[in-house]
Amino acid sequence: MKHYELLFILKPTLTEEEVKAKVDFVKEVITKNGGEIATVIEMGTRKLAYTIKKYERGTYFVIYYKAPPALLAELTRNVRITEDIIRFLSVKYENKREIAAWERLCKGIKQTIKKEPREPRAPREPRVEKVDEQTFTEE
């Protein structure tokens, strides 16, 4: 089974019950066709970068799942005919590095870069500007 991620945006006008029904529908399509859902993340309602189907906001969801490759065509077909999903993106994780990232994302672990503290620097000496002394004579 391959590792996948499905991000989809629902209309912001849906009630909580309708949102739950749409998410359950997508989860059902995945499980009925032989997929295993690892995690579902609700990212909340956010402003869209640009207007999509006359909507400026949308409710974001991400589903991480494992599935046979044949499921992707069926899932795409079902998501496209669902009018309440205004946009979706499906991502396939292939190599070991990507699969490791998929597993971290499923667990909700954010990748952080550990920075080692730098050694303290010696204090700088105050800068003194030398001005050439010029003598002016009156004529």
UniProtKB/Swiss-Prot annotation:
UniProt-listed CDD domains: bS6
Superkingdom as given in the UniProt entry: Bacteria
GO BP annotations, alphabetical order: translation
Record keywords, A-Z: Ribonucleoprotein, Ribosomal protein, RNA-binding, rRNA-binding
GO molecular function, one term: small ribosomal subunit rRNA binding
InterPro entries (alphabetical): Ribosomal_bS6, Ribosomal_bS6_sf, Ribosomal_S6_plastid/chlpt, Transl_elong_EF1B/ribsomal_bS6
Start-end of Basic and acidic residues biased regions: 114-133
GO cellular component, one term: cytosolic small ribosomal subunit
TM segment ranges: none
Its job: Binds together with bS18 to 16S ribosomal RNA.
NCBIfam families found in the cross-reference section: S6
Family to which the UniProt record says this protein belongs: Belongs to the bacterial ribosomal protein bS6 family.
Name of the protein in its database record: Small ribosomal subunit protein bS6
Taxonomic source organism: Campylobacter concisus (strain 13826)
Source organism phylogeny: Bacteria, Pseudomonadati, Campylobacterota, Epsilonproteobacteria, Campylobacterales
Originating gene: rpsF
